[in-house]
Amino acid sequence: QGVQLAYHHHMGTIVETSEEIDLLMENTADSLGLLLDTGHLTYAGGDPIATFEKYQNRIVHVHLKDIRTEVLKDAQNRNLSFLDSVLNGVFTVPGDGDIDYLSLFIALREAQYSGWLVVEAEQDPAIAKPLIYAKLGFNNIQHFAQKAGLNLTVPWA
């Protein structure tokens, strides 16, 4: 009681694409929330902003992960596995890739989203130093939030 369940779509699972998210949402009760993962949805060819707008009443958690489109195209051209794509640097922190985070943050503000926003990178720590990228991601989401007029609460501040 009092616990909100949410499904996390993810590459390598039964729900990866926008169409599969649609099927999940259409065939489950409204009480099941959705964790929107911007990087994984973009990797699967989806649009995180359109998905947020479509399911904003059921999204209870957001993973903010950016994608490097050129690395993704190279991985697709070479038929690399998902894991090899990750190791080649397909993902990064928000603002260091090609997802339109300003538009997403405007949509979050307009929907009065109040759930968690969690920065993820899924990068090789030997190449992308975690502390450097954690700071970069934090600074970038602060910048996008300010430009979008979205007030963020930092849990440790």
Identify the meaning behind each predicted range.
Residues 1-33:
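Active-site acidic/histidine proton-transfer and metal-coordination neighborhood
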Residues 5, 37, 62, 108, ...:
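Conserved, mostly hydrophobic/aromatic
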Residues 23-27, 107, 140, 144:
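A generic secondary-structure signal
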Residues 18, 22, 42-114, 128-132:
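Gly/Pro-rich active-site loop or hairpin
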Residues 10-12, 37-41, 65-67, 91, ...:
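Active-site beta-loop-alpha junctions enriched in small/polar residues
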Residues 1-4, 28-33, 58-60, 111-115, ...:
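Short, well-ordered coil/turn segments that N-cap beta-strands
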